[in-house]
Structure formats: C-alpha cells, structure tokens
C-alpha cells in the first residue's frame, strides 16, 4: 500500500502537484526570520489591541482576526504570519480549481500555480500581516465563484458571491473595483440575464448587511 502511494503516477498527479505548491508557499511565507517584523504589522498589532467597527484607513476584519490569533497563539513571528500564509495556500488551491474548471490541462495548472506561488508581490503580501493577503484571497474567491456560476449556471452561487463580497469589503474597500468589473462584464454580454435573478439581489443585500456596521 505504501509503495502504491509513492508510485510515480501518484507523486505526479494533479492533486499531488497542488500539495507541493501549497507546501512550498507555506514554507516560503512562514520562515523568512531574517527580515523580522514589517513596520505596518506593528500598526495592525495596535489596532488588534483596540478593536472597533472601523479605522481611519482599514476596515475591521483583519485587525479582528489578528486579535483572535494573538489570543490563541500569542504574538510570535510564526503566529503573526500564519493567516497570511494560509491565505496564500488557499489562493493556490483555488487557482488550480479555476484552471481546471476553465478547461486547462496539467501544464496549464502547473504554469498558473507557479505564477501565484512565486510571484514577488504575492510573496511579499503573504509574508507580512496586512490586509493584502486577505484581500487577494477575497478577490480570488469572488472569481472562483463567478467561474463556478458560469460553468454550472446555478444561480445559488450569487448567495456565496454576496457573502464573499461582504467579507471582502470588511477587508479592503478596493474590492469594489472587481465588483464593478464583473458588473460591466455581465452588462455587456449575454450573461446580463442574471440581473433578473432573485439570488443576485439577495447576494447584494447580504454583502451590504455584512459591510453596513
């Protein structure tokens, strides 16, 4: 059984490749000890000590999550960078799934995963505790939901879209740019039919209610 697991076919399967990229992402993002804390992280630590419904330049979700992490694990280098690294790993998984849903073969998945794993700006965002890693995850989740919706034409995905959009707004308001882009894409294509969908407007209400506090 052990030999079967370690067979070349399994070690080079699509699922195995995704696991390798996820592990690579986690290792790169969790262990850059020589850099120490980034100065913006001190700002987020201060906000997590003074929780509120919003701040001058940051919505409340990311400081709130940091407060939970610090309560559970303290304020060590590893604990502070755990969630951004996990966000990066989830982006890897979602990217693989999106490529597959859009008809990409094995080579396309490897290329896409290489890009999202080692792109310098991604590595920076996922190696420090700011809103960037969480924001990128929300963007990726919104795109994943849209790809799934267009693939299946299941209108229930609008509910999930609204939930992710609401959490994205609680992370960084610039996710509105993506929402506006999707709005235009729907308006200018045959998929404008979704504007008549009850689920789309339910999703919009959910996003508004999440963001409203």
Describe the predicted segments one by one.
Residues 21-22, 112-117, 165, 169:
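Short helix- or helix-capping micro-motifs
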Residues 50, 145, 157-173, 211:
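Membrane-interface alpha helices of multi-pass inner-membrane proteins
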Residues 151, 178-208:
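Perimembrane helix-loop-helix junctions
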